[in-house]
């Protein structure tokens, strides 16, 4: 299976087993006890869980997502990684995750890459107050999303810092500042467009989240976010927006686990004569239910605005929906099947620009323009066998994309191969 198909399988597994990490932080010293109990190794103040993952070993039947004359290749991706924690009594916890994707293609040397990534987080517990900060860095050649078919080197950075306060035993409020940065190499082009011209961006903002614990396993929440996007080479894309999203969170031990947030976003471009406005529904949902301890059903749904690399269609509304089933067969075997659909509904620029990606001159567009919609489907099946701290699996994944306007955007792809995860 390729990296993108494996990421999808990982999302299915996450929906089946874990709540949303971003919106279900516990912020208490019990995490320190959990780290000391579950870490695989302990040396001095350091607790660590190293692992090695064979993300894929198999065949990609359409390496470049080509509409015609697809080219196949044998591929492998190996990822050594480690989680490291440093507890400080019961007052603080430092955590970092480091790893590298080693991507290899047998025939297409241009698709090979080394993709390092690291994340870190620190929490300081002061009775009812928790101070936290985290950050992440990824330098990768893997595809940015399901729109950009080119494997292009880019750097993603993110940082967050904030405070969570327990006002009562059941009610807490959290506020945080956010920063994100995306940078593509300057010589990377797709369809004649330099990706750095349309995608290099910096996002700053803050969020305020209130949580009310209804039961030990269920929490109601409301999150408000204010965001500002600035583009290095395309200032006409600069914008401000806010999101208001009520939601509910369930801990893993609940009958239903995961989280669901549904709300409203208002997107306001700084140059409203060029970029279209958007206001409407946004959502982040990932829920799972386990039947009789052996069959787990998962559902995911996401809807939000995402920037496009296209000059004349600067962003799209991404509607993603998925369903998955995991069935345990005895103590060691399991079977996972999933189906996902991603719909990208593009918004047209209010002005015309040259196809070079350098929007230096503009002219008004005359007449109505049909909305472009691209749909990507993915069907995945995997059989796994657990060995100690690891899992060996064989998977098959079929991808299909159609577009109502761009025939050359359509493709299909059958991928199959082996995955191995082992924790030391």
Ranges and model annotations:
Residues 24-424:
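Gram-negative and organellar
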């Amino acid at each position: 299976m390729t990296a993108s198909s494996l990421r999808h399988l990982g999302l299915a597994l996450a929906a089946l087993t874990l709540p949303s990490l971003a919106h279900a932080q516990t912020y208490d010293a019990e995490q320190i006890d959990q780290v000391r109990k579950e870490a695989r190794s302990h040396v001095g103040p350091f607790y660590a869980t190293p692992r090695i993952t064979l993300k894929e070993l198999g065949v990609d039947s359409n390496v470049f997502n080509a509409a015609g004359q697809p080219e196949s290749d044998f591929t492998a991706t190996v990822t050594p990684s480690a989680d490291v924690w440093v507890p400080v009594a019961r007052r603080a916890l430092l955590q970092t995750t480091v790893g590298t994707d080693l991507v290899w293609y047998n025939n297409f040397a241009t698709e090979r890459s080394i993709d390092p990534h690291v994340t870190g987080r620190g929490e300081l517990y002061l009775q009812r107050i928790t101070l936290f900060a985290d950050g992440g860095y990824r330098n990768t050649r893997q595809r940015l999303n399901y729109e950009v078919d080119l494997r292009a080197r880019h750097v993603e950075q993110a940082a967050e810092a904030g405070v969570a306060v327990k006002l009562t035993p059941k009610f807490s409020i959290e506020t945080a500042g956010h920063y994100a940065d995306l940078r593509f190499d300057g010589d990377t082009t797709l369809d004649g467009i330099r990706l750095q011209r349309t995608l290099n961006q910096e996002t700053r903002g803050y969020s305020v989240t209130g949580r009310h614990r209804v039961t030990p396993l269920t929490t109601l929440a409301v999150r408000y976010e204010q965001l500002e996007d600035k583009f290095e080479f395309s200032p006409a894309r600069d914008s401000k927006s806010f999101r208001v999203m009520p939601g509910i969170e369930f801990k893993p031990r609940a009958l239903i686990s995961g989280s669901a947030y549904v709300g409203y976003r208002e997107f306001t471009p700084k140059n409203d004569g060029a970029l279209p406005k958007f206001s409407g529904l946004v959502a982040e949902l990932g829920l799972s239910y386990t039947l009789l301890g052996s069959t787990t059903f998962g559902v995911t749904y996401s809807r939000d605005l995402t920037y496009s690399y296209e000059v004349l269609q600067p962003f799209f509304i991404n509607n993603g929906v998925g369903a998955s089933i995991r069935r345990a067969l005895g103590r060691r075997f399991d079977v996972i099947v999933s189906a996902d659909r991603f719909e990208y509904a593009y918004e047209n620029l209010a002005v015309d620009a040259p196809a070079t990606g350098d929007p230096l001159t503009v002219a008004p567009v005359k007449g109505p323009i049909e909305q472009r919609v691209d749909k990507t489907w993915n069907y995945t099946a995997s059989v796994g066998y657990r060995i100690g701290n690891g899992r060996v699996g064989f998977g098959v994944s079929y991808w299909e994309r159609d577009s109502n306007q761009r025939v050359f955007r359509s493709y299909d792809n059958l991928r199959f191969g082996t995955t191995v995860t082992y924790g030391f």
